[in-house]
Amino acid sequence: MPMSSPIGRLLAATFLFIAVAGSAHADTLRLGINDSPQNAAIELAAQLVKEKGVEVEVLSFSDWNTPNLALANGDIDVNYFQHQPFLENAIEQNGYDLVPVAYGVENKVGLYSKKITRFDQVKDGDTVAVADDPVNQGRGLHLYQRAGLITLRDGTGPKASLADITANPRHLKFIELPGPQLARVLDDVTLAQSYPSHILAAGTTDPGSALLFSRDEESGHLYALRFVVTSKNVDNPAVKAFVDVFQNDPRVRAAIAQAYGNPDLYALAWLPARKEASR
């Protein structure tokens, strides 16, 4: 059938539409995130990467479990909310085929209080808060140990749990909460583990006022957020284009700095340590 016929022209137009639509879908990136001060920078990067022909749909999740489930199910193409230990635990627990492909910002974690200013003011039987997921709970418990409030079993690593506490001389009562909620319980507990990013988002206190911060540099940026994809998507050019803009565009970097307002609350994990002071 000659393509000059009406049906031929219709088929040609249909094939062209499918080709264009398929190309557009290939360059449309569905990015899953959590509530974070970085979100303004993420949205800015999503606008800037349009110059490279990539459309980004940013989807925000309210918990720490759904972003990985959505990624594994193909509902999104990449997520950005978790550090390596959290990802490894999610893979172990759920069998996800997920791979980290790039570093993002590393958030400090701290012990916050609106009731005390020194750890020696903690009273016998006080209630304190930690994250309820295995990895972030361990990170918080190591802070409580550094503060001199508890002792953990020798050799306890990132997955320390309440069961690993071998000494609790002040008989602290630990409550376990989802990470994003920890910033909102400071009126109800003596101490709470929390991320400055969550404190910023909640507006409950000064994010720089933690009595103790983590020493993340010592872990080799183990707790930096990662851009994560499925294994079949590791070479996705749209992901690479977005990450390039997020990491290297000075406007995005300025948006990150403005969001945190304090360079001591975060690190740009993709940069050599010697450059971070000038971030």
Regions found by a protein language model. Give the residues of each.
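Short, polar/charged alpha-helical segment
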Residues: 35-57
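Ligand-binding "clamshell"
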Residues: 89-101, 114-116, 188, 193, ...
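Beta->alpha turn/N-cap motifs
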Residues: 36, 60-64, 74, 79-88, ...
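Short helix-initiation/N-cap motifs at beta->coil->alpha
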Residues: 59-69, 156-184
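Bacterial N-terminal signal peptides that target proteins for export
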Residues: 1-12
